[in-house]
């Protein structure tokens, strides 16, 4: 385009800038000592302070008549500007102690107190603790001589931790500028605040059993129970009270419990060749125990989720699709009682029993080593996880949104056309509703990493009198995925798929040298 092309004075120009600085100061003191050669102690005291500050501005104007006039001041029409700043800080004091008796019994404890600027002045400090104990059964007199048992440990722990991850300043009542009423500039109340905001707390309990055999096979079992209380949530409130329709509060109780299993071992191990396999699997159950003010259910209208006491917080709340009426091509749904109807009603939504957070997940891998050559592969999988495919909803919407662009070819080939057609795509002209037909199983199996490397033998490197290690390697990530999900990638970070970029395939070649 010519530099002075006519644009009828519709050009725009903007300038923006932002700066952020994060300062962290940490001081620790550590003391180790032993008594009678059998009691070992390790004590640490510490303090940490964190301060974050950011500020920025933006200026925007309209009416530039040439692309050579790039300054904001060259605009002939009204400009708009905005600036912002944000700060938060933490202050922490902590201590940790460890005890070891003859490498048979181990104990540890920790205690910390933290202050966050994100809470009201009377609730900024939170105190958290942990206790742990481990019994090294293998070191007992009756097991230490058993050569076939290389590891036997039992561990238990309990403790609390805190969470303060909410936006800055939400404990404050704020006003904002830029308001205009009857051509008079002024301020308006933009946030109601809550000086009672404080730390969210999680109480965690763990049990672990670790076994090893013949110095080549290892098993691990862990069970846990976590209870989170005083959760930081946006609680709905009347607009007449807050002006926003919600307020941040400490409410509710949520529980998670589950198990984790892992195993690895050398199937074959000789001087020159080793074949190792490993696998892990975990199961987690999430349940909401309490909400707020005696409320037992709350609908999150933007996510298709409904928080119901006794259910998972990631369970979908949707209408159930019953297919297409073969006589006339109309959409059908199940009502709340399971009867088929051609009316779509919000009141017929039900808890589906399907969740975004997968209860089952795990991985497995194998590696081969022959002299300096090594090949390894790592897989990951997720089971029984569901995601709303929002792309499919739009691609099969027909005329729902007033346009028929970018539609799936299923609307052409698979839709209902005449009485007697059996299909799940309704006749043309039906208004598509967001229901559980678009709730897809996003379980998958993925090859996360494949690597091949070769290390030159030491006998050759010694002759160079220069290199102590030379390793040539190549690796690939995310080579393939097995899934029934219709989107580009089942491993999305939210419960709604909206054409997010899939995990990229990555290939790496390299040489590692040591001198």
Say what each PLM segment does.
Residues 249, 268-356, 387, 396:
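Conserved small-residue
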Residues 347-348, 360-361, 373, 431-436:
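Short, flexible active-site loops
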Residues 355-388:
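Glycine-rich, aromatic-lined ligand/substrate-binding cores of catalytic
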């Amino acid at each position: 385009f010519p530099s002075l092309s006519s644009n009828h004075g519709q050009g725009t120009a903007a300038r923006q800038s932002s700066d952020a600085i994060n300062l962290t100061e940490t001081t620790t003191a550590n003391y180790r000592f032993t008594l009678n050669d059998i009691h070992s102690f390790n004590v640490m005291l510490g303090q940490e302070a964190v301060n974050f500050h950011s500020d920025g501005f933006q200026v925007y104007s309209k009416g530039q008549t040439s692309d050579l006039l790039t300054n904001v001041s060259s605009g002939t029409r009204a400009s708009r500007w905005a600036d912002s700043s944000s700060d938060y800080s933490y202050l922490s004091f902590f201590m940790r102690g460890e005890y070891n008796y003859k490498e048979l019994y181990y104990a540890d404890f920790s205690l910390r107190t933290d202050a966050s600027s994100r809470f009201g002045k009377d609730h900024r400090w939170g105190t958290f603790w942990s206790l742990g104990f481990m019994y090294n059964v293998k070191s007992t007199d009756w097991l230490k001589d058993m050569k076939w048992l290389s590891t036997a440990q039992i561990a238990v722990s309990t403790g609390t931790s805190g969470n303060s991850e909410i936006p800055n300043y939400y404990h404050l009542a704020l006003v904002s500028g830029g308001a205009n009423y009857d051509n008079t500039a002024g301020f308006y109340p933009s946030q109601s605040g809550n000086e009672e905001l404080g730390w969210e707390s999680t109480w965690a309990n763990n049990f672990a059993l670790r076994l090893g055999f013949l110095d080549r096979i290892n098993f691990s079992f862990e069970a846990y129970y976590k209870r989170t209380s005083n959760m930081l949530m946006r609680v709905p409130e009347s607009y007449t009270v807050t002006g926003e329709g919600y307020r941040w509060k400490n409410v509710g109780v949520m529980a998670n419990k589950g198990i984790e299993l892992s195993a690895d071992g050398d199937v074959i191990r000789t001087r020159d060749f080793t074949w190792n396999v490993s696998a892990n699997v975990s199961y987690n159950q999430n349940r909401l125990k309490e909400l707020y003010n005696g409320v037992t259910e709350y609908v999150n209208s933007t996510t298709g989720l409904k928080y119901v006491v006794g259910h998972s917080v990631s369970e979908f709340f949707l209408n159930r699709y019953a297919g297409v009426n073969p006589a006339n091509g109309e959409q059908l749904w199940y009502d709340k009682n399971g009867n088929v109807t051609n009316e779509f009603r919000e009141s017929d939504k039900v808890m589906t029993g399907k969740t975004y957070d997968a209860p089952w997940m795990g991985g497995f891998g194998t590696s081969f080593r022959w002299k300096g050559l090594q090949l390894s592969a790592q897989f990951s999988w997720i089971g029984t996880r569901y995601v709303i495919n929002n792309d499919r909803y739009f691609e099969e919407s027909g005329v729902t949104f007033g346009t028929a662009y970018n539609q799936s070819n299923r609307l052409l080939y698979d839709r209902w056309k005449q009485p007697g057609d059996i299909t799940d795509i309704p006749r043309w002209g039906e208004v598509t509703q967001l229901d559980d037909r678009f709730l897809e199983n996003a379980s998958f199996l993925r090859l996360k990493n494949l690597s091949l490397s070769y290390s030159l033998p030491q006998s050759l490197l010694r002759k160079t009198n220069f290199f102590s290690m030379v390793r040539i390697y190549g690796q690939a990530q995310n080579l393939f995925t097995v899934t029934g999900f219709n989107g580009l990638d089942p491993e999305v970070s939210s419960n709604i798929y909206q054409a997010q970029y899939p995990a990229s395939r990555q290939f790496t070649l390299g040489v590692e040298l040591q001198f």
